[in-house]
């Protein structure tokens, strides 16, 4: 893709956004239902393309966490479909009166929510973001330009094609949703300069991506949290609740960027809490690493009974 191709793509998306902004709630929900139907119909093709991306990433020796974020399964497609259903069920964010007052000159002043226009989204490995973001943008009346990671390109192209075909079937402009298929990093930087056509940029990924967007983007940007993912267990903690929170924060999806990294336990609750926590984690895909303090208190040679647990062995961890 050349710079002019990118500009042409953003112009088309910008023009389409003017049509989408006038869609009624019923229009948007019907369109999302059609996208839901077509993704469900094409799940085999989605999985086929995803397998190509997975194999390419394995050939590049990507690690387990990376492959896990990249991988789509029947279950993950069900979650994608559930996500669209949940978005359909949301109240329309457009057209809400958030302030209404009469000024001194008797003029009625109203503050009403409207679409932003065109949203650019740069994300990394996870292809399910393609449907999440597209659905949220349609629901909020915004057109979107997607820039996914090169490793998930085949899956993203497949998903975007299904969405664009749904737009055509609905009888509207398929430029509501566009995907930048180039893997050239120069194109990414050019993308961040197009504030004439893009109203907001959202990076979804690691610290380096977020910092790069914050530094390079000429349009406003919204960045997600990339901060500390720690949990502290206080002596006053409800042990059962604390274990449940830790498991949900880590074991439910350990490969994502906001999964729990560090567990800090107060020494007063450590003798009671740690053995129960270890038992709960023993069947998860998490590898527990701990300071010698824990080892001295409990004489734990290894919380999983061997030098590496069965899940860690599958991941090639030592």
Language model features: what each stretch is:
Residues 1-108:
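N-terminal Rossmann-like NAD(P)+-binding subdomain of aldehyde/semialdehyde dehydrogenases
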Residues 5, 9, 16, 27, ...:
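General structural feature for long, well-ordered alpha-helical segments within catalytic domains
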Residues 50, 54, 181-183, 292:
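A general secondary-structure junction signal
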Residues 65, 69, 144-148, 262:
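Short amphipathic alpha-helical segments at helix-loop
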Residues 89, 98-240:
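Rossmann-like NAD(P) dinucleotide-binding subdomain of oxidoreductase/dehydrogenase enzymes
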């Amino acid at each position: 893709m050349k710079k002019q191709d990118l500009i042409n793509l953003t112009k088309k998306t910008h023009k389409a956004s003017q049509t989408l902004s006038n869609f009624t709630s019923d229009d948007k929900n019907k369109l999302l239902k059609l996208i839901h139907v077509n993704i469900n119909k094409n799940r085999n093709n989605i999985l086929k393309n995803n397998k190509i991306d997975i194999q390419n990433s394995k050939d590049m020796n990507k690690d387990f966490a990376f492959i896990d974020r990249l991988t789509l399964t029947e279950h993950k497609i069900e979650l994608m479909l559930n996500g669209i259903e949940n978005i359909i069920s949301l109240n329309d964010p457009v057209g809400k009166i958030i302030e209404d007052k009469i000024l001194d000159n008797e003029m009625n002043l109203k503050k009403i929510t409207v679409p932003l226009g065109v949203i650019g989204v740069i994300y990394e490995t996870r292809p399910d973001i393609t449907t999440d973001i597209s659905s949220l943008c349609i629901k909020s009346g915004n057109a979107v330009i997607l820039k996914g990671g090169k490793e998930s390109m085949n899956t993203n192209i497949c998903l975007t094609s299904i969405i664009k075909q749904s737009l055509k079937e609905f009888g509207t402009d398929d430029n509501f949703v566009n995907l930048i298929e180039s893997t050239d990093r120069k194109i990414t930087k050019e993308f961040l300069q197009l504030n004439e056509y893009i109203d907001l940029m959202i990076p979804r990924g690691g610290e380096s991506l977020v910092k790069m967007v914050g530094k390079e983007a000429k349009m406003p940007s919204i960045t997600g949290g990339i901060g500390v993912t720690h949990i502290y267990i206080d002596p006053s903690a409800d042990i059962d609740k604390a274990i449940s929170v830790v498991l949900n924060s880590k074991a439910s999806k350990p490969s994502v960027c906001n999964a729990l990294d560090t567990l800090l336990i107060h020494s007063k609750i450590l003798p009671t809490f740690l053995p129960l926590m270890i038992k709960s984690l023993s069947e998860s895909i998490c590898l527990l690493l701990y300071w010698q303090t824990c080892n001295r208190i409990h004489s734990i040679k290894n919380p999983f009974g061997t030098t590496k647990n069965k899940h860690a062995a599958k991941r090639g961890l030592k």
